[in-house]
């Protein structure tokens, strides 16, 4: 599962395809709130207790790719994005607070 950075509106997002774990495409902010750098797309992708995560490359903090929360420091969070692949087009939409709560 490799990540790729992309522009979305006025900021960067990190998109991950996880065929070996879940056959999912997931997207979160590329900006790491701990390091202050757009670097999440270069993080190491894995699984912690069944949850897909990305480890920030600088401080190795794990962020859930499902809901964006930092597992070690819950006060830090990444925004998550709804992603779908239609034919050969990747469609991305920002999630609302209601989407995350559901």
What kind of feature is each model-predicted range?
Residues 32, 56-59:
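Short cysteine clusters
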Residues 73-74:
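Short Gly/Pro-enriched turn/cap motifs at secondary-structure boundaries
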């Amino acid at each position: 599962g490799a990540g790729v950075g992309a522009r979305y509106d006025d900021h960067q997002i990190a998109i991950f395809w996880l065929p070996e774990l879940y056959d999912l495409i997931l997207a979160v902010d590329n900006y790491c709130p701990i390091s202050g750098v757009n670097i999440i797309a270069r993080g190491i992708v894995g699984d912690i207790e069944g949850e897909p995560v990305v480890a920030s490359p600088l401080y190795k903090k794990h962020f859930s790719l499902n809901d964006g929360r930092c597992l070690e420091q819950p006060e830090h969070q990444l925004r998550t994005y709804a992603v779908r692949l239609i034919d050969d087009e990747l469609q991305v939409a920002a999630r609302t607070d209601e989407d995350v709560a559901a």
